[in-house]
């Protein structure tokens, strides 16, 4: 067996480091399923980038969204963060689904995201972002490479299962980098 994953920590770190380099100082993280290794790595990248930029990881800027009823939870989470830290100037979304709901929230509340005063960054892309948030930086997943490696690993697994008595090699894990797109420059 084996697996193909993206480098979640490096992608998150690069996005948040970019926001900090652009001068954003109060960068919130909006996440879900914090117990999953993927989300843990994304959170770790966020924290590491803040620390390297000399920024305090303010717990009031941490937004955890429950999956069930996530549309309302995103609104409630953003309401809470903006009430506690009204000068929040950046948002890092750990998934494109959370970012999409946040864009709806910003639109519904008349929060202008087009002028660059709010830094926006997201792990993964949604075609909507180019229209609704063209300045949102994203870590694009290399879908074609992921597919190619997954097929290669699957074919290897099939070959090995058809060779009785053969020595099974150790499972192979492939970690691929994200393609960073800093769109606010």
What are these regions (language model features)?
Residues 3-14, 30-77, 92-101, 122-126, ...:
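Hinge/beta->alpha junction and helix N-cap segments in small-molecule ligand-binding domains
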Residues 24-26, 89:
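Short acidic/polar active-site loop segments enriched in Thr and Asp
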Residues 26-27, 57-61, 112-119:
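Short acidic capping loops at alpha-helix termini that bridge into adjacent secondary structure
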Residues 79-185:
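Flexible loop/turn connectors
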């Amino acid at each position: 067996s084996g697996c193909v994953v993206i480098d979640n920590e490096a992608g998150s770190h690069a996005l948040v480091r970019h926001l900090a380099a652009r001068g954003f100082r109060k960068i919130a993280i909006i996440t879900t399923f914090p117990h999953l290794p993927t989300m843990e790595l994304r959170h770790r990248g966020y924290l590491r980038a803040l620390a390297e930029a000399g920024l305090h990881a303010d717990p009031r800027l941490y937004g955890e969204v429950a999956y069930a009823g996530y549309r309302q939870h995103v609104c409630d989470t953003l309401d809470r963060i903006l009430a506690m830290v009204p000068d929040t100037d950046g948002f890092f979304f750990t998934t494109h689904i959370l970012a999409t709901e946040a864009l709806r929230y910003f639109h519904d509340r008349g929060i202008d995201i087009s002028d660059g005063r709010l830094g926006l960054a997201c792990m993964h892309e949604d075609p909507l972002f180019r229209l609704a948030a063209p300045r949102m930086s994203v870590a694009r997943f290399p879908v074609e490479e992921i597919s190619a490696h997954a097929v290669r690993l699957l074919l290897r697994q099939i070959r090995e299962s058809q060779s009785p008595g053969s020595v099974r090699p150790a499972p192979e894990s492939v970690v691929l980098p994200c393609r960073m797109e800093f769109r606010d420059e």
